[in-house]
Amino acid sequence: MRLTTEGLEASRLLKKGREELAERVTGRYFERRPQWEKSCKHARQKCAEDTRHHLDYLSEALSLSRPAIFADYVVWVAALLARLNIPGEALNTHLALLRDTIADQFATAGSSLAARDITMHYVDGALAKISQAVPEVNCFLDGEGAFDILARDYLEDLLQGNRRRAGQRILAAVELGSSIHDIYLRVFQRVLHEVGRLWQCNRIGVAQEHYCTASTQMIMSQFYPKIFSTERKGRRLVAACVGGDLHEIGIRMVTDFFEMDGWDTFYLGANVPVSGVLQQIAERTPHVLAISATLSSHLQAVADLLAAVRATANPPRLLVGGRPFNALPDLWKDIGADGCAGDAAEAVAVADGWSV
């Protein structure tokens, strides 16, 4: 991993002072913008929460020597706030206060000048990036092919709260000859990406987003009699979301693809602690461990888990995936993995390549 001493020092100080920094930044923010606190009942609480998120992503970026982790997160926040009609100046002010407050706290804590400077550099880089135009996120369901139309109709059913019709639509497509692989990748995956985009655009709420995800998981389960009937090939997979990550549907799809490829799989679900993963590796002796991370704030947890697995007597191959790895294609090398995959089909292809 391409780590730096000053980055690790800065990350450690941010984690140690997280709560105090959040409170100090929030206090300074409302000293400058008292009208914002008056206009929203929970403004101070929300500001402190947002500050903690900023600190978490900044800490991850510093610990992995990856300024793009924080910069990309800030651009995402800027896009979200723009669609909520919150002026961009609010985020600029917030980040500038964050930078100055960190500098003050680092000086008080006796940090090295290098640790302070690299932190300021990361924040200033993110500020410079959001001064550019915030890119639009295009619809994931464009096109007029059969699967494009099916995906749009399926999403419309879910947004109307009609899970039964959505499921019937998918089952009918399979009966007419569509493969489960295509349904997963060309319908479910794209629809869930579109659901995320709609949430970011403030067109649906968290409850609708969760409903769409839960409904899709339920519909996926109807395919399990077929998925688990594939001829076995004598290879084993353990799959899980890293501790703290509650977004499990992606790694569930990956696990199902391995099952359809003939692997014996052991799916551990979301938010699995290191001890739980190590226990399963000892008991199942898998050939591959697949770990998913949805947010960049979980990357250090992934690195810690992979290091713990590598320290075991006979570690499996380590495969990672998730949004942070898609955004930074070579990140998996720095984090200690053996490979990375952008979707379920690629994950199986990578793992099958290791068995040759």
What are these model-predicted stretches?
Residues 235, 263, 316-317, 338:
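A structural micro-motif
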Residues 75-78, 96, 171, 274-282, ...:
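Amphipathic, non-transmembrane alpha-helical secondary structure
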